[in-house]
Amino acid sequence: MKPLHTGFAVALGLVALAGGCGGSAADVAPTTTATDTAAVIEKPFLDGYGGQSLAELLAMTDTYRTDSVVLAVEGALLQKANADLSAPERVVLAVEALEREVNNGGYNQFFLNEPSYAHQIGAALNEIGCPETARITEDALAVLGLRPDWTDEQISVAAADMTDDQMAKLEPFDDAFFAYPDPIADRLLAFIRANAAEIRL
C-alpha cells in the first residue's frame, strides 16, 4: 500500500500540533476537505480468493483495490484445468502473468517463467484495451527473437541464454512497462465485467 500523500501527512501533523498548543487546525494549516482525504487514503487490499462467485468479487471493487480483486479472479482461474479455460479466461491469466513476472524481474523473467503466454500476450493486451503495453511487449519479444513455431521450452531456453547485449536492450522496455502507459488493472477489470458470462470461477 502506498504511503499517505506528503501534503496530507503534514496537514495531520499540524492538526496535532495545534491541538497540543490549544489552537485550532485553521490557525496553522490549510483546510483539508473530505475529498482531499478520500483521494489520499487507498482502499484495502483483498487478501486472495476465498471461494466467492465472480459477481461477488466484482461487487467488492467498491470496497477493495481493483488490482487485488483482479488478482483474486486470477487465483480462482488458476485452480481450473487448462483445457477447461475459455478464451476470455486465458486472456485474464496471460495479462496477470505478464504483470506479475515483469514487475518482479522484467520481461526476461516473464519469458523464462511464463513461456506459454508469449505467443498470445500481445493480442491479449490489445483485446483488453492496452495498446501501448502491447507495443512495448511486442518490442521486448522482438529482442528475444520469438518465432511463431517456438515451443514453450524453446522460449524458456532462449530467455535463459539471452546475451548481455540482449538484456541491455530489454531494459528500456522494462522501464516503459513500469511507467504503466495503460491502466492495466482497470482495463482488465472492465474486460472481466464485459465477458462475465464466459468467466466461471
What are these regions (language model features)?
Residues 32-104, 108-118, 124-201:
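Extended, alpha-helix-rich binding/interface surfaces that flank or overlap catalytic cores
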Residues 21-24:
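Bacterial signal peptide processing site
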Residues 9-18:
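Bacterial N-terminal signal peptides
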Residues 1-8:
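Bacterial N-terminal signal peptides that target proteins for export
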